[in-house]
Each structure stands twice: as C-alpha cells, then as structure tokens.
C-alpha cells in the first residue's frame, strides 16, 4: 500500500504541474513563465547565434533554437522562426523589436507571456517598411503573406498574453459636456471599477449622437480624489457624451481603454505613398502592419494585445488580425486549447480590425476596434460558422476600397464607373461598410456594440453560396447561407451609424454579364429563408431569433430586416428617423407560411438626449436632426412594409409634434413612396402608447403600395375597436362599416381585407398605346369609388397590379390606357376556403372576339391536370364558380371566384398553389379598343354622337365629310365620323344653352388614328354672354399615340375645359352652346376617326 507521505508528494507535484503549464508547449510544461524555459539562449549573447555575433541592422535571421529576447536589437529585415525555434520575450520592461516581417512555421514559436503568466511590462513589435513599391512580398511554403507581416503558417505557434485590467470597456453613468467639463473638472464617472486603468493610458469615449466623429480619445492622468469608478482626463473634451438611461433606452457612451502592455504597430510615414486612387481617398500613409494565421498552425492566442497603425488599405488579406482559411480552430478541429482573440485593441486601422476567413470555432471576446477602414469585425466569405463574437466594441468604421461592399458611392463610381452594359454603376451595389459584417448566420453575437459606421452597424447578409476563395468549397458541401438560421443574437447595441442593423441582401458571386451587369462582389438582392435543414430549401422553415438589441441615434433607420421566419424581441430603439422596418417581398413572400414578428419591445421617438451640432448635422427644433427635408422628414417608430407582420406587446413612447416646426411624428407608419405590396394579414395587438400625439400616420404619397397600406388591430388597443382594420382615407375603401379618424387621416373599418392581383400574362401581344399601363378598380358599381394602380416596377411594361379589397363587396377592373390584355390572370391572395366573390373585367368590345375563362393553380393554364374551364351563362344571376357572364351592352365580363382549398394563416395561397382565374381574349377585334367600360357600365351621359348625331345638334352640326358606315371598323356599332385636321377644318356641335355648366364630370371621345401617327386635336366650348357668341381657349388632347385600327378613349375632366374660359366669364356661365373639335397645329395632319362623343354626368 502506498504510504500517506508519498500520496501527499504526488498531490503537490500535480498542483505544481498545473501552475507551470505553458499553452501548447508540451516540452516545457513544468515552467511557470515562458522566459524560464530551460535552454533558452539569450539574444544578447553572441554565442547564441551560429555566426557567433549578434544580428546587425538590416539582417535577415533564422531562429531554429529557443531564443530569449532580452535586449532591443537593431532594425532587422526578416525573422524566420521554424524547426524547433522559439522567440520568447524576457519579462522586463520596454523591449522593442523593429523588423520587416516575422514568419513562424514548421515548429516555430513566438511567445510573449502565457495564460498562466501574463506579460506585465511594455513590449513592442514594430513592423517597418517604407512603401508597397520597395518591400518584398513574403511567402512561407508557397503561401503569400505580403509585407510588414507576422505570418503563422503550418506548424507555427503564436502566444501573446498581456496582463489586462479588470475592465476593457465600460460606460459613462453621468453626462459630460464641453461646457461643464474642463481641466478643472475633468473626471469621468463610469459604470465599473477602473482603478487599475494605468496612468498615461489612452482611452476612447464614443459618440452618443448621430455623428460618429464625435467619438474622441484622451489620456488618463493621476487623480488622488477619484473613486474606484472614476478617472481623470488630461485634455478637455470636445463633444457632449450622454451618460444616462433615457426613456427606458440605454444611450450611455462607451468608454474604452485602448492601451495594452504588448503593442504591435506599423511604422508609417507622413504622406501617402501609393497609387493616385488610394491617395485621393486616403491622403496619408495607409501601409500598416498585419498578422495572418493560416491552416495548420499549432496554437494561436491573442490576449490583451494593442494593434496600432495596422492593415493595408490597398491589398486584400492585409488585416490587423486575420485567421485565413484555417478551417476549425476549436476542439472539433483538434485543438485542446482553441484559438481566441481576447481583450485586444485595434485602433487606427487602414483595413478592418478582426477578420475570420473560412475559419470556424474562433472566439473573439472583449475586444475593441476603433477608427478603421472597411468592415471592422468581419466574416469574409459566408462559409464561416460557430464563431463567437462576445462583448466587443467597434467604433468609427469608415468606407474602404477593397470590395464594392466596403466602398462609398463615390469610390464605387471612381473604381468602376460603368457596369457590364455601360450603364452607370449604381450606389446600391456598394455603400454597405459595417462594423460587424456577418455573412453567415450560424455564428454567435452577444453583448457587442457597434458605435459609428459610415453605413451600417451590424449587417447580416445571405448569399446563395459562400463567396471568394470559399465558393467552390461551399458548393461542394452545399453550404447555403440564405437557408441557415441565426445561431445566437443577444443583447447587442448599435448607435451613431447611418443604419443600425441591416438584415438583408447578399454578395454577387459571378462576374458581370449582360443579364447580371453588376460587378463581382457587389451588393445584390437576396432573400433569407432559414430552414430546419439548411441544405434543403424544401425543408420546414426555422425561426431566426434576434433577442435583445439597443439601437439609437442612427441617421436613417434603426433596423431593417427582410426575410422569412424572423422573431425580434426585447428591442429598445430610440432617436432614429425610422425605428424598425420589416420587409419580405414586393409581390408574394418568397418564404411561404411564415411571418415576421416583433414583440416585447420599446420604441422611443425622441429621448432626452438632444445631442450637439457637428459635421453638417444641424440643430432643428432644439435638437440634432440629420433626417433631411429641412428637418421635417417624418419620424416613424415602426414602419410597415410588405408583410405578413405581427406587432405584439409593444410600447411606443415620446412621439410628439413640437413647435415651431410641428414635424410629423408617429408611432406606427408605412414605408413612404411605396410601389410594392402590403399584406392584408398584418396585425397589431397589446400596444401601449406613452406621450404620443399620433399613433398611426398615412403619408400623402399615393404610389401603388401607399394606396393599399393596411393593418388589423386585433384587440383594439390602438383603434379602440377590436378586430378592426385601418386603411387610407379613400372613397374606394369608405363603406358604411367605416369611420374617419382625422388625426391619422385614416379609415377604421369593421371589414375583412383581402388582396387581388391583376396580371398581364402576355405583354408581347398587348396593344400598348403608350409607355404607361394601369388598371382601375371600382367598388360596388359606383364610379367614384375607384382606385387606379400603375403596376409593380418589376417588369417593363408593368404587368402586375395589386389591390386591397373587402370581402363581400363587388369589384370591377378597367384598363384606361390600352386594350385589355389578351391573356389576363386574376390572382386572389389571402382568401380562405369556401370564400367567394364576383368581379368584373372590362373587355372593351363585344363583337369580333372570343372569350375563354379558366380556373387554374399557379397560372398553369397550359397543364390540363390543373385546369377547369368555365362556361358562359346568359344572366348575371346565374353566375357560379363554374360559369361566367358577358354583358354585350357594357362589354363587361363577370366571373365568380370560389376558393376550394384551405390555406395556412400566414400563407397567401393554399398549400397546393394559388387558385387563379385566367381570361383569354382572341378574335379579329381583340386588342382594338381601350379596355375602359366605365361610362357604359355606370355612367349616364349626354351624347353628341353615337351612330347618329344627337337631334339637339342636327341643325348646326358641321363637318367636312359625311358619316361613315362600316361595322367592321366602327368602335361599337356601324357608324363613325371622319376628321381631316387642316388649318381651317373643324367639327362643330352647336345648340342653344343645352349643355349645363354643372353636373358634368367628363367629356369623352373615342379616337382612331387611321394610321400610326401623332395627330394633335383640341376641344373648344361655345358659350354666350349678352348675346355675344364666344369660344373658350382650345384644350389640347395630349395623347400622341393614336394608332391605326385602335380605338382610344380620351377622357377629359369637364372642369379642365371650363377652366380655359376667361376668369371673369366662368361664374357668369350657367350653360354652354356646344363645342368644336379643331386642329391643334397650323399644318395639315393625317385623317383620323371619331366615335361615341359624349358628356358624362357626375352621378
């Protein structure tokens, strides 16, 4: 049996071993500190060197044995550490190594301190070199490392461990201002204990306003009266820095310690030594140092390192700390002690801060990146996964030159002025530089801060496959970032950027071409569709959860999130032009059966942090305001767009319209100038408003998407009417179940909203009479209850028209600018099983056409397995889901839609596809007549000519030739009028006070160009005052697209004709004596034909 004493000795021995291990260096695991390793040869001893003399200035040396750095050597060329070579720093103060490059590989090690023995003195490595033109590009085993580099290749080890303070960065707890903070009162009070922050250290105080340049540095001086959470500054401050939680949002400035014991820096000159393009944008020396680690390294740990004057603005892969193509660097990659970057500080970087390139499992914790060019914390290609970014601070991220997504718009147009097709490069291809660039969602972001970026704080992007050097590997292993859920996003903070958080877009993976002319690596549209199996787009959707974010003082938008199954919770947002916007698709969400949710969040319009004017950010209404429109751009807390969206358990606070400008400020609004769809299923509930003047705001803009803006208030917490819907204040929506809410300029209705798309499936055969297209919808056969849509901008000419409609109402659709398309598809959205509605389509002509109506699924009218043909009936009352009715008098086609299949609540269509109706129009008269039946279907009219001249005008009717009778050519019947526009010719319809001056809405005339031409004709009204016969000024018909064999409707507001009378005559006229049709030009014009001339009464 082993004696007790022997057991005790073994225990003590094991404890000693634990205390003497050096990371990854099994040969010396009984040594407490690296500089105590046996057999270390002192640099200062000439016997340590093969040449038996110390290295001299400008010499390159190979280190193949353990060397102890115990003196400051002269400036050296290249140090190669390999075989069993080690370069270990002696634990003494102020050692500096100045060298052009350090290359570590094949068993080589660079060691300053260890995990058990942090380096507590000042140590500096300065990488020297004058310019890109004079320095040699270094290589290891054929791998390029560039210039001014510490390179770690296969078999290499780098261990840099500095003694650090308890707190790397913290926050202010009281506001400081230049007016009250000076050399006599220059103490910062901070959130955490900072009594170990060294005197003389440099600190950063971040901006708490819209201008990131309000971030500023200072130095700590001795303070005998400071508490443990206070420091005294050397210099006065320049800007106001907020130091409290305001209205529930933490807007306190971050205060960070930039100085570390171990410093790696680049030697830089006073001027730019580079090509003209680089120097134009960066008129200073941007040729900094960099560290690159490649696959196969033994160990790589960076703990408490300061990196200054690092990165190279002109070359890819020359970044301060760069894990390059390393694969896994954690336990799964075979590392007992996984790689990490902790408590480091990068400042004054000419290219990025911390870069993870085709590397998985890296820990980046409690670091600082300040004043950097290009993305700061970066996942390069979109193949990087399982990396952890925790408690990092990034501040002042500037535009860079390397890739389009780094560049400003100006940089983009300078570097690549035109795309593949010769068109100017679009700014949207660029302008995406971000403090955190997250190109693959399967990574962790916890407790990070992005404080200031020229563009964006945190950007999640979703390319189809990884880009760059990882592209082929990504395809091989079927890695699709756009299908990958977010691994973890928790409690991140973004402020003082242009945009806070961006969740959208991707990088172009292919070279430019005719069909995709954008440059390689430019920003493109992409759709995020997270899946339970990210390798299979057909697997079930999987939610991506963003839990906790503080977002404030961003010039434009707090957060923009486009994608499928997105959950946002515990957000706190304040002082942004737009707090939060969800987006999905402009037509139908690409990710069906899912929605977007935000809940348990706070959005504040304007906090107590009023800011300080600087850098073209003016003071408006007593506070900084960067938003534009002379300070009047509306504030929107939550901006509704696309959908389907759900807001639940939200608090909106401090949305006030204050004097003297009374700027529009609303808790909830809609995307302005919107061309795209809005889901009829978007809902809000459990909403609380605190100090809010306007809960909802509808903009004045009336683009297609603006007109269909809507949401449903499920519980009445906003409208005081549960299960009500909000829509724009338009007659089209105003039913007996609606009431007007004046402060919102909105209608609140007890109606059920649905959507209908009218789609032109044959634009090639459509007889477009101009470049414009539109569809008019009319509700319940009342002509003034109409809305006109010009179509979604995803096709030219526009071919898809969206309408928001109410269940249990009737809708007709007309085509006022051209004949009804020969193939028309009606696509109902968000209808439920067994629901039905009847609608009308204007065909425009009743003779010489053939109609065919089909019920299809997803437009598959060419596939008989999914087609059901409808058949005509002879009465409106006999319409069913299997029949249609065509009214030959009005040329209106009436069809019933019946939804056979059920749909999930969030799906726009049933699971088996959208049930649609397809109308096919053929025959010799197809495409001959404008598809506008409004006058025939709803209006009462005063006709001047239709087959015959109205008897009121028979005695005075004048024209140069007689009426033509030709049923094959006439608009509707058998007769029409010819007109030969010469300098003196005209057609007159004269009567005696037969046309009332009130009660008429339109003048209409149908025109056939006889041949394709640009004929110009005008209309004049006759009237009399005191027996004097007078004429109005001519009203020129501005339609210049009359075509041969096409009848075009010209509809003129009667008010526009009357307004051409002399102003002093208008109020004297109670009736008119007729009108004339005249030539608008002095020269003779080709003949044209006229038909169905009438006035339409205002019903």
Curated annotation (Swiss-Prot):
Residues 47-174 form the G8 domain. PROSITE patterns: G8. Glycans are attached at residues 62, 137, 664, 764, 858. Keywords: Glycoprotein, Glycosidase, Hydrolase, Signal. Residues 1-24 form the signal peptide. The keyword Glycoprotein applies. One of its GO terms (molecular function) is hydrolase activity, acting on glycosyl bonds. InterPro entries: CEMIP/CEMIP2, CEMIP_beta-hel_dom, CEMIP_X, G8_domain. Pfam families: CEMIP_beta-hel, CEMIP_X, G8. The keyword ATP-binding does not apply. Belongs to the CEMIP family. This is Protein DDB_G0287365. It comes from Dictyostelium discoideum. The lineage of its organism: Eukaryota, Amoebozoa, Evosea, Eumycetozoa, Dictyostelia.
């Amino acid at each position: 049996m082993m004696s007790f004493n022997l057991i005790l000795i073994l225990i003590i021995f094991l404890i000693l071993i634990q205390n003497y291990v050096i990371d990854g260096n099994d040969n010396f695991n009984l040594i407490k500190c690296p500089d105590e390793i046996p057999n270390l040869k002192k640099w200062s001893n000439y016997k340590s060197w093969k040449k038996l003399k110390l290295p001299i200035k400008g010499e390159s040396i190979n280190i193949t044995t353990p060397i102890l750095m115990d003196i400051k050597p002269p400036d050296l060329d290249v140090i190669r550490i390999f075989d069993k070579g080690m370069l270990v720093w002696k634990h003494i103060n102020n050692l500096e190594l100045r060298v052009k490059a350090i290359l570590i590989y094949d068993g080589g090690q660079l060691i300053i301190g260890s995990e058990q023995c942090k380096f507590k003195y000042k140590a500096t490595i300065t990488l020297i070199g004058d310019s890109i033109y004079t320095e040699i590009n270094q290589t290891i085993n054929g791998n390029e490392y560039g210039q001014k580099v510490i390179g770690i290749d296969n078999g290499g080890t780098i261990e840099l461990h500095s003694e650090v303070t308890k707190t790397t960065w913290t926050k202010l707890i009281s506001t400081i201002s230049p007016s009250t903070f000076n050399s006599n009162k220059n103490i910062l009070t901070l959130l955490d204990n900072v009594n170990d922050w060294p005197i003389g250290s440099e600190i950063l105080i971040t901006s708490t306003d819209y201008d990131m340049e309000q971030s500023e540095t200072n130095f700590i001086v001795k303070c005998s009266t400071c508490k443990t959470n206070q420091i005294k500054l050397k210099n006065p401050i320049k800007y106001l820095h907020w130091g409290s939680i305001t209205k529930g949002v933490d807007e306190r400035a971050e205060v960070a310690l930039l100085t570390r014991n171990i410093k790696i820096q680049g030697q830089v000159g006073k001027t730019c030594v580079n090509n003209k393009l680089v120097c134009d944008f960066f008129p200073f020396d941007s040729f900094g140092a960099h560290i690159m680690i490649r696959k196969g390294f033994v160990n790589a740990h960076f703990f408490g390192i300061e990196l200054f004057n690092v990165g190279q603005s002109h070359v890819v892969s020359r970044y301060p700390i760069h894990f390059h193509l390393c694969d896994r660097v954690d336990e799964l990659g075979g590392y007992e002690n996984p790689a990490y970057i902790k408590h480091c500080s990068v400042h004054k970087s000419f290219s990025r801060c911390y870069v993870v390139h085709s590397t998985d499992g890296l820990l980046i914790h409690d670091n600082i990146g300040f004043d950097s060019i290009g993305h700061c914390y970066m996942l390069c290609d979109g193949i990087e996964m399982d990396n952890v970014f925790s408690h990092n601070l990034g501040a002042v991220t500037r535009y860079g030159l390397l890739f389009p997504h780094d560049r400003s718009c100006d940089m983009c147009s300078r570097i690549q002025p035109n795309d593949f097709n010769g068109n100017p490069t679009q700014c949207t291809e660029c302008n995406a530089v971000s403090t955190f660039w997250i190109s693959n969602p399967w990574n962790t972001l916890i407790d990070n801060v992005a404080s200031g970026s020229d563009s964006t704080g945190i950007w999640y992007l979703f390319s189809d496959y990884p880009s760059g050097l990882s592209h082929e590997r990504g395809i091989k292993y079927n890695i699709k970032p756009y299908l990958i859920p977010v691994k973890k996003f928790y409690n991140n903070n973004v402020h003082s950027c242009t945009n806070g958080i961006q969740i959208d877009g991707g990088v172009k993976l292919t070279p430019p071409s005719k069909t995709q002319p954008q440059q390689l690596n430019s920003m493109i549209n992409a759709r995020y569709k997270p899946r339970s199996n990210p390798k299979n787009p057909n697997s079930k959707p999987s939610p991506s959860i963003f839990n906790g974010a503080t977002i404030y003082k961003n010039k434009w938008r707090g957060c923009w999130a486009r994608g499928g199954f997105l959950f946002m919770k515990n957000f706190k947002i304040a002082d942004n032009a737009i707090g939060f916007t969800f987006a999905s698709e402009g037509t139908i969400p690409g990710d069906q059966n899912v929605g977007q949710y935000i809940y348990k969040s706070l959005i504040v319009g304007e906090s107590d942090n009023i800011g300080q004017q600087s850098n073209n950010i003016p003071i408006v209404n007593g506070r900084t305001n960067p938003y534009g429109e002379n300070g009047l751009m509306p504030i929107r807390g939550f901006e509704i767009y696309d959908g389907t969206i759900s807001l639940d358990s939200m608090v909106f606070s401090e949305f006030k319209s204050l004097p003297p400008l009374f700027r529009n400020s609303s808790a909830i609004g809609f995307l302005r100038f919107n061309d795209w769809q809005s889901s009829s299923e978007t809902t809000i509930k459990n909403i609380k408003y605190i100090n809010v003047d306007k809960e909802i705001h509808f903009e004045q803009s009336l683009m297609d998407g603006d007109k269909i803006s809507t949401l449903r208030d499920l519980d009445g917490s906003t409208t005081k009417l549960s299960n009500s819907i909000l829509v724009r204040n338009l007659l089209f929506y105003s039913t007996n179940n609606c009431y007007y809410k004046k402060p919102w300029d909105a209608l609140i209705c007890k109606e059920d909203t649905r959507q209908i798309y009218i789609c032109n499936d044959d634009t090639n055969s459509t007889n477009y009479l101009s470049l414009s297209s539109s569809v008019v919808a009319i509700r319940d056969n009342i002509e003034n209850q109409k809305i006109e849509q010009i179509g979604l901008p995803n096709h030219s000419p526009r071919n898809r028209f969206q309408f928001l409609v109410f269940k249990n109402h009737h809708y007709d659709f007309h085509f006022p600018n051209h004949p009804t398309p020969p193939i028309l598809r009606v696509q109902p959205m968000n209808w439920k099983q067994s629901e039905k509605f009847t609608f009308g389509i204007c065909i425009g002509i009743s003779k010489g056409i053939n109609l065919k109506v089909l019920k299809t699924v997803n437009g598959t009218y060419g596939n008989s397995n999914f087609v059901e043909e409808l058949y005509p009936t002879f009465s409106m009352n006999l319409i069913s889901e299997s029949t249609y009715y065509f009214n030959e008098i009005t040329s209106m086609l009436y069809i019933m839609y019946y939804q056979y299949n059920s749909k999930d609540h969030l799906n726009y269509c049933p699971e088996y596809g959208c049930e649609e109706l397809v109308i096919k129009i053929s025959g010799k008269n197809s495409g001959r007549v404008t598809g506008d039946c409004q006058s025939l279907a709803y209006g009462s009219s005063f006709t001047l000519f239709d087959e015959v001249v109205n008897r009121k005008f028979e005695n005075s009717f004048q024209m140069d030739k007689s009426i033509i009778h030709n049923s094959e050519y006439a608009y509707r019947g058998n007769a029409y009028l010819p007109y030969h526009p010469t300098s003196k010719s005209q057609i007159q319809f004269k009567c005696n006070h037969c046309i009332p001056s009130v009660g008429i809405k339109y003048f209409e005339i149908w025109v056939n160009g006889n041949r394709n031409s640009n004929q110009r004709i005008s209309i004049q009204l006759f009237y009399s005052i005191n027996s004097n016969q007078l004429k109005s000024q001519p009203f020129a018909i501005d339609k210049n697209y009359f075509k041969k064999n096409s009848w075009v409707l010209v509809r003129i507001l009667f008010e526009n004709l009357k307004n051409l009378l002399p102003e002093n005559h208008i109020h004297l006229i109670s009736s008119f004596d007729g009108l004339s049709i005249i030539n608008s030009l002095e020269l003779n014009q080709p003949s044209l034909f006229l038909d169905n001339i009438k006035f339409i009464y205002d019903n």
